């Protein structure tokens, strides 16, 4: 009986701790702040982006498929669209389609960098409802490849700077606009820009590139719009798995063919996901957004020491973005075997695309995969990859500037750090700055986000204006 009382007492104590922690896990008090409206020519911002969309700046890994004239057409258009930028800023053209604008500040102790890329991915025009390079505006929507990724922020940066310069504004410190024309093919354009910064000993205190956005229904139990600012991005590795054999006729196979061995390896990897690691970006997001969730989810996020296993199992079963925030993910994307149905291949291979949690490295991820497969006949080879980026600070003036610009533009949204699961050019800036933030200055629906790299990419015209407003607010603090 005493044991029963002890068990009941422990359970009551545990319940009390859980409920007390849940009750304390509420939105943090914030000082009330008003934001002055930002006035500028929003129609001109839309027209500028429309004209940029008409430039077919499609990048390919096979350079012979590219049209260099289209890239030069876009660059030649910039002085016309942004004349004040060309009056006050100097442009340095760097190899591999790198464009670096310099806007001198009143002082030169530190610098801010606003990034974007002006190349776009290929299109399948027959699957589009509107032509992807004509810049058609219909019912308040601009259609075209690059409207979201990322000519909207390219235009946002330059339109904001053009407006501020016309108003006689000069930043307190230097500002650079760093644009790449090879981001979509992982080209060296951004790397060349970073090397330029290193060679000229530029003290970079703030970098802003594409990344999160203002979105809804992305966090359990939260109904308000969430403005997600990436403070790190996952690493990436394309891993090749291969198995060799003597080959032969399919009529007399051995127990396991190369394809069978690969299939077994694939199943083992998919059935044994990487361990959950709640690193700083995810932990800060849970702490920020979790406080605004429903009671049940607040109880979970306030007591991950107790409910972490439940969250882990839910994420493993459902997959998706929340799962990707907490572990290294593996997606098998390619497989190759025999060229004939009745021939056992002398070799077979498959490739997985891995996105590495900040707790992992390419080396540790390969070791985990090797251990899960447990078959020396399966050879692993890293085709290409990069480790996760450093994690940027959030308790600093640089973060405050970005967060303030977001809050002023999308008033009522919940501004939160997060871990970016895609790759961007900003990953190259780790060696030159501890304050690299990934935010695409747009409010997007789930349907709109699905058009990025897909068919029918488009943007609402009012969103174009808000992108410019964000950069005006941000540059005004630099």
Protein language model regions, located:
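Acidic/His- and Gly-rich active-site-bordering loop/insert found
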Residues: 5-145, 167-171
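An extended, acidic, His-containing surface patch that forms the Zn2+-binding/catalytic region
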Residues: 92, 107-109, 215-216, 278-339, ...
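Short glycine/serine- and small hydrophobic-enriched flexible loop segments
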Residues: 18-21, 159-166, 264-268, 473-476
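Acidic/histidine-rich catalytic neighborhood of metal-dependent amide-processing enzymes
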Residues: 142-144, 148-228
